[in-house]
């Protein structure tokens, strides 16, 4: 493990001995709910718990997890390095003994050790009983938590639409790294220039490889610890004179499985659209391709109307109108949605259209437009009613608290790719036509789809609406305490909430007893 993974002396020392494995069997047996339940069963009153800010309780819970990780042999000495204590401190002790800088280092450590996101056990357990964009709903005046957020959230097989959902998830997991490589090669001009200088970029990592470069783990809300966000890709730039963080670019990547097709299947409706788009690239043929499926990934709505929440991308350009489009007379949407629809309506997306791979050189590149550039702009903007916008909104809120003076630019990046032809299977494709300052070429793996379109959509956010989230963390903690103390009387007899929702409830000290040591 290279010491450049973590910027700064603290991270360099920490990384040497405590890089955590992605799989830690048993860690899901202790959630934030269990931390609160232990407090209730030990005789603490709700009033005493609520007298300490929720961020300190979240940190106390994390200290319990870290103690378990050390005791289980997954790391050594992480607890004293992070919390300056050989025993998990209480929320009161953390508030009294740790400085804001100490707390920030703990939160950045959590971020750095959860970069694999869904592939990381620590990420999974920390997201339990945590408000995220997916557990928020947006009502008329402000966001609030969904009724079912305070429970173990597990993805189960079966049910209507599962196969379709599983396909979309698999396509996304496989091709997010493909989109990341395209962003590095064509979209963000400074990403690779100083890769060996981690201080230029997002605080804790520049990525081990092109697969995970500039990836982000779980970043917790510094105010309450009750909200969290996991960004797909973030790039930080510092002021060369002051070394202060000046700019942060955040990319939320979405891979659209609904456009997957094989061009060898001439019966597929997208096959002909694809050929026309490559033969005559332009706004009209790109539009026809995007609208070439039953439920297009871009929704047209008339300028005097409001969109639905079905798709993340919108257009109200006259040339994109469909014959059956009708203006809605309903007053739909919350205040925050209406405000951001107004702000983003004039935004235009940057679109990269990729030609066919060259099998002689095993390479692929975007087409060159008459302007001489490798991209064009189209009248496509983000839908503030869609979950993707809300995800980006929460991410920006959480990140802005760490870097209040930095300029944060948000982008939704939509990747559309096709299945490989028979003669394309197994090929690693070099990305050509990108920046000339790359130290070495970036290539797509043999498992990646063949890129068709990469759509970069800027997202405009009104920070005045951050106040809508600022009180939500405290309210969520108060709700958590109320629910936990209400359940405490039955907790000993009921199945324990934790791994599998059926584990035996151990005592507080039992958690810290190591199982058979697992060395990594």
From Swiss-Prot:
Site feature location: Required for function: 176, 232, 252, 254
Gene Ontology CC terms: host cell cytoplasm; host cell nucleus
Enzyme class: hydrolase
InterPro entries: Herpes_alk_exo, PDDEXK-like_dom_sf, Restrct_endonuc-II-like, Viral_alk_exo
Subcellular location: Host nucleus; Host cytoplasm
GO molecular function, one term: exonuclease activity
Domain of life from the UniProt record: Viruses
Keyword set, alphabetical order: Endonuclease, Exonuclease, Host cytoplasm, Host nucleus, Host-virus interaction, Hydrolase, Nuclease
Pfam families tied to this protein: Viral_alk_exo
EC numbers on record: 3.1.-.-
Presence of the UniProt keyword Nuclease in the record: yes
Family, as annotated: Belongs to the herpesviridae alkaline nuclease family.
Function comment: Plays a role in processing non linear or branched viral DNA intermediates in order to promote the production of mature packaged unit-length linear progeny viral DNA molecules. Exhibits endonuclease and exonuclease activities and accepts both double-stranded and single-stranded DNA as substrate. Exonuclease digestion of DNA is in the 5'-> 3' direction and the products are 5'-monophosphate nucleosides. Additionally, forms a recombinase with the major DNA-binding protein, which displays strand exchange activity.
Complex and partners: Interacts with major DNA-binding protein; this interaction increases the nuclease processivity of the alkaline exonuclease.
Protein name: Alkaline nuclease
Source organism of the structure: Psittacid herpesvirus 1 (isolate Amazon parrot/-/97-0001/1997) (PsHV-1)
Lineage summary: Viruses, Duplodnaviria, Heunggongvirae, Peploviricota, Herviviricetes
């Amino acid at each position: 493990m290279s010491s450049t993974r973590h910027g700064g002396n603290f991270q360099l020392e920490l990384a040497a001995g405590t890089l955590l494995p992605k799989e830690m069997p048993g860690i899901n047996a202790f959630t934030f709910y269990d931390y609160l339940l232990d407090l209730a069963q030990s005789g603490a009153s709700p009033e005493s718990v609520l007298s300490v800010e929720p961020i300190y309780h979240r940190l106390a819970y994390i200290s319990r997890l870290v103690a378990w990780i050390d005791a289980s042999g997954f790391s050594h000495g992480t607890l004293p390095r992070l919390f300056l204590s050989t025993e998990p401190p209480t929320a009161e002790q953390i508030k009294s003994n740790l400085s804001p800088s100490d707390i920030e280092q703990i939160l950045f450590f959590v971020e750095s050790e959860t970069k694999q996101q869904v592939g990381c056990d620590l990420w999974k357990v920390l997201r339990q009983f945590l408000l995220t964009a997916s557990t928020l709903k947006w009502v008329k005046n402000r966001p609030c938590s969904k009724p079912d957020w305070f429970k173990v959230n597990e993805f189960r097989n079966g049910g209507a639409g599962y196969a379709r959902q599983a396909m979309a998830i698999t396509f996304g997991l496989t091709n997010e790294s493909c989109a990341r490589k395209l962003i590095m090669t064509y979209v963000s001009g400074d990403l690779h220039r100083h890769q060996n200088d981690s201080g230029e970029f997002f605080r804790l990592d520049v990525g081990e490889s092109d697969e995970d470069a500039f990836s982000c783990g779980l970043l917790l809300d510094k105010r309450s610890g009750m909200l969290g966000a996991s960004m797909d890709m973030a790039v930080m730039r510092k002021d060369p004179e002051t070394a202060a963080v000046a700019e942060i670019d955040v990319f939320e990547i979405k891979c659209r499985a609904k456009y997957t097709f094989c061009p060898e299947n001439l019966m597929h409706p997208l096959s002909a659209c694809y050929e026309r788009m490559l033969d005559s690239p332009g706004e009209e043929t790109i539009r026809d391709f995007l609208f070439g499926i039953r439920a297009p990934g871009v929704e047209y709505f008339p300028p005097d109307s409001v969109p639905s929440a079905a798709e993340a991308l919108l257009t109200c350009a006259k040339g994109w109108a469909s014959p059956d489009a009708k203006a809605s007379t309903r007053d739909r949407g919350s205040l925050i949605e209406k405000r951001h629809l107004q702000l983003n309506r004039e935004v235009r997306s940057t679109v990269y259209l990729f030609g066919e791979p060259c099998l002689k050189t095993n390479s692929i590149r975007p087409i060159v437009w008459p302007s001489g550039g490798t991209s064009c702009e189209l009248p496509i903007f983000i839908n503030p009613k869609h979950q993707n916008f809300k995800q980006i909104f929460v991410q920006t809120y959480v990140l802005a608290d760490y870097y209040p003076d930095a300029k944060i630019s948000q982008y939704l990046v939509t990747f559309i790719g096709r299945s490989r032809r028979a003669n394309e299977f197994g090929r690693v494709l070099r990305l050509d036509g990108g920046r000339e300052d790359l130290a070495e070429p970036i290539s797509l793996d043999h498992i990646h789809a063949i890129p068709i379109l990469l759509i970069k959509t800027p997202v405009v956010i009104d920070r005045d609406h951050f106040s809508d989230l600022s009180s939500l963390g405290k309210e969520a903690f108060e709700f958590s305490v109320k629910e936990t103390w209400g359940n405490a009387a039955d907790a000993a007899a009921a199945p324990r909430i934790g791994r599998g929702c059926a584990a035996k409830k151990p005592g507080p000290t039992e958690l810290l007893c190591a199982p058979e040591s697992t060395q990594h």
